[in-house]
Regions:
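N-terminal targeting segments with Sec-dependent signals, encompassing both cleavable signal peptides
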Residues: 1-194, 198, 203-209, 216-219, ...
Length: 243
């Protein structure tokens, strides 16, 4: 399944006395001169992903007693597929607060899904009210459980690979194709789903065009199309018959 967005805690704070440029400069050179809100804010306005990662790491180190900074570090590790590190970091985040936090529960639910522990994931998602990505996570969980109609409901009007996949698995090929069409930044998985939609619609040109994009973005994923039954008749049609 396409990756879920992890739950970072971001703040839109009104910082007095410092411009955005000054905050960025200090976050790079002297992060300990910024307060926790300023340093967390720096990560949201960083010009590059590398800078954002640096600011998140600095905040978690300097303000380790603030569960928000530690949760953000864990979310960053989880996004980088560092599952063991993320698990340990979320434990530290939970230990840094006296109250259960929805964001930590949500991220731990993602860890549980990755570990195929759907029961634990469902329990934790039930304690994640208020997290913006909750519907998306519930949708993915229901896809893994085979509850495709419920997954469609969970995603609502979401425009994502996961939402398109739920529609596709529910037999709503046209709706799945429409969702993919409206994704602004398509990746290899987007085009793969689009290719399946085209195959189910009998659109050979669409299959070819979308799989070409898959190959351009992810050659390993493109290879899997060779054994995917969704495309069998289209691949076979390219083989010259024997006379």
């Amino acid at each position: 399944l396409p990756k879920l967005r992890r739950s970072h805690l971001t703040l839109t704070v009104k910082v007095t006395g410092k411009t955005d440029e000054e905050i960025i400069a200090l976050a790079k050179s002297n992060p300990d001169t910024l307060n926790v809100e300023e340093l967390m804010f720096a990560a949201t306005i960083a010009e590059t992903e590398e800078d954002a990662a640096q600011f998140i790491a600095s905040a978690a180190e300097i303000y380790a007693a603030d569960w928000r900074t530690v949760n953000n570090l864990g979310a960053q590790e989880l996004a980088g597929d560092k599952y063991a590190d993320a698990t340990a970091t979320f434990e530290k985040a939970a230990a840094a607060t006296e109250n259960e936090q929805a964001e930590i529960n949500f991220n731990n639910a993602l860890i549980s899904m990755i570990n195929s522990d759907n029961a634990k994931a469902e329990e934790l998602l039930g304690k994640s009210a208020g997290v913006a990505q909750l519907g998306e996570a519930q949708g993915v969980l229901n896809i893994t459980k085979g509850n495709y109609a419920q997954a469609v409901s969970d995603f609502g009007a979401s425009t994502s690979n996961n939402a398109a996949l739920a529609q596709l698995l529910s037999g709503n090929t046209d709706k799945a194709a429409s969702i993919i069409e409206n994704i602004a930044n398509k990746n290899a998985k987007s085009y793969y789903i689009a290719a399946i939609c085209a195959a189910r619609a009998g659109d050979a040109a669409g299959v070819t065009a979308n799989l070409a994009k898959v190959k351009e973005l992810d050659e390993e994923m493109a290879k899997s199309a060779l054994t995917d039954l969704e495309f069998a008749k289209f691949l076979a049609a390219e083989v010259a018959p024997v006379q």
